[in-house]
């Protein structure tokens, strides 16, 4: 439990931005059982559909609860492997900014999660997310703290990214 889903909704509200749900959570909730390796490809396809539907609306900012990197990482974490077509697509569809939620919140079991999620398992998953995102050249900002401070940390990261992006566009416009 990193507070990612709650944070996604709060950020979308703060920035008046469209947001996506977590395809794996939705998929498994519909199935009513734990995820299996045979579910990875349908989850990935659903994730792509969710992203593509959201991206078509012309907004300047989108908040995704997860993307294909989550599918890749959890598949490796749970099953030790992932279908080969997913990783190249992760890189091709890489988001502009990733907020990596810390594991500093108290763990709360939900029906989606596999295992007991011991502190060591949570740290391993967090480290795997950090290394895969970094290895794939993703722009990553850490988000930690509790409650409103966590939200403010995330808002600050996005505002900084937006201002840097706007400044880069302005410099490009000036040089043309």
Give residue spans per PLM region.
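Conserved substrate/cofactor phosphate-moiety recognition/catalytic segment
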Residues: 9-52
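Catalytic phosphate/metal-binding cores of nucleic-acid and nucleotide-processing enzymes, i.e., regions
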Residues: 31, 61, 163
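Walker A (P-loop) phosphate-binding loop of P-loop NTPases
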Residues: 1
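Short, glycine/charged-enriched secondary-structure capping and boundary segments
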Residues: 11, 34-35, 76-79, 112-116, ...
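Glycine-rich phosphate-binding loop used to anchor ATP phosphates in small-molecule kinases
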Residues: 42-93, 100, 108
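Conserved lysine of the Walker
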Residues: 4
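A short acidic, often aromatic-flanked loop/helix-cap motif at beta-alpha or helix-coil junctions
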Residues: 27-28, 147-152
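A glycine- and Lys/Arg-enriched "phosphate-lid" helix/loop adjacent to the NTP-binding pocket
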Residues: 79-149, 162, 168-173
């Amino acid at each position: 439990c990193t507070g990612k889903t709650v944070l996604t909704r709060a950020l979308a509200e703060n920035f008046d931005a469209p947001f996506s749900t977590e395809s794996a959570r939705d998929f498994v909730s519909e199935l009513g059982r734990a995820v299996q390796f045979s579910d990875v490809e349908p989850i990935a396809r659903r994730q792509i559909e969710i992203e593509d539907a959201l991206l078509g609306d012309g907004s300047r900012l989108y908040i995704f609860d997860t993307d294909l990197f989550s599918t890749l990482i959890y598949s490796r974490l749970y099953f030790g492997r992932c279908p080969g077509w997913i990783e190249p697509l992760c890189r091709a569809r890489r988001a502009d900014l990733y907020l990596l939620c810390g594991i500093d919140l108290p763990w709360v079991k939900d029906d989606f999660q596999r295992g007991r999620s011991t502190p060591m398992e949570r740290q391993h998953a967090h480290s795997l997310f950090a290394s895969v995102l970094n290895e794939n050249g993703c722009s990553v900002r850490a988000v930690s703290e509790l409650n409103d401070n966590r939200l403010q940390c995330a808002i600050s990261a996005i505002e900084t990214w937006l201002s840097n992006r706007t400044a880069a566009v302005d410099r490009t416009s000036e040089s043309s």
